[in-house]
A protein has these predicted regions:
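Conserved N-terminal beta1-alpha1 strand-loop-helix module at the mouth
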Residues: 19-226
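Low-acidity, Ser/Thr- and Arg-rich intrinsically disordered low-complexity segments
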Residues: 2-10, 14-16
Length: 226
């Protein structure tokens, strides 16, 4: 490419150069059915989360998750969501499900071996003791409340403080009624929704998924036109 100095660039050339369009990353978590997976594919989400924590109503076995993940195109990242797993559980999920990302509490990664082919998605919780200096400046991370899947909205001011400094996905209690407010006030890199797009615990509503995605993409479009 030929570089031009500012003095050699005409006004028409300058106006034709557009800044990269902003796109909020969308992660739909807790997928358990083929219909929900097909819905997120058709509506262009960025990350698909499968929960391997047995205490969750969204729990899915690695084998069943692999069958659903095989439907997902490569441009959508597959995320294995685990909570305080044993090394054996981690190895089974990695071997059978073959995720792009492994999502766990940041502390869980300290004693867990992860192959270099898999990205880590560390979860930092809004527990009032968070040290921002511990969060990577370059790696994608997730910020949510003290308990996953509770449906409780993460503190807006705390989310804002984290998002200003880090590459953060905001999770915890998001739904179609509050995501726009969070986007406007926090402006995170991404949003993660689970219970907020369900008809009942563990069962995704395609209508709610579509509505949530539409609100986020309309926000993106408005921001890009400002």
């Amino acid at each position: 490419a030929i570089s031009r100095s500012p003095s050699n660039t005409t006004e028409d050339e300058s106006s034709s150069k557009q800044a990269p369009k902003m796109k909020t990353l969308i992660k739909i978590c807790g997928l358990t059915t083929a219909s929900a997976v097909e819905c997120i594919i058709e509506n262009s989400v960025d990350m698909a989360g499968f929960v391997f924590a047995k205490q969750s109503p969204r729990y899915i076995t690695p084998k069943n998750a692999k069958q659903l993940a095989d439907l997902i195109p490569k441009h959508i990242s597959k995320v294995a969501v685990m909570l305080h797993p044993t090394p054996t559980e981690v190895n089974e999920v990695i071997d059978v499900f073959k995720p792009d990302y492994l999502q766990m509490d940041a502390k869980d990664f300290l004693n867990t071996y992860i192959p270099k082919s898999i990205e880590s998605l560390k979860v930092y919780r809004d527990d009032g003791c968070l040290d921002l200096s511990l969060i990577s400046d370059s790696k994608l991370t997730l910020f949510e409340g003290t308990k996953s899947g509770s449906g409780k909205l993460t503190n807006i001011e705390h989310s804002k403080a984290v998002s200003k400094k880090k590459r953060v996905i905001i999770a915890g209690g998001l739904n179609s009624n509050n995501v726009l407010n969070v986007l406007n006030k926090v402006g995170p890199l991404g949003v993660d929704v689970s219970s907020g797009v369900e008809s009942e615990p563990g069962l995704k509503s395609e209508q709610k998924i579509i509505q949530f995605i539409r609100i986020v993409r309309e926000y993106d479009e408005k921001k890009n036109n400002e």
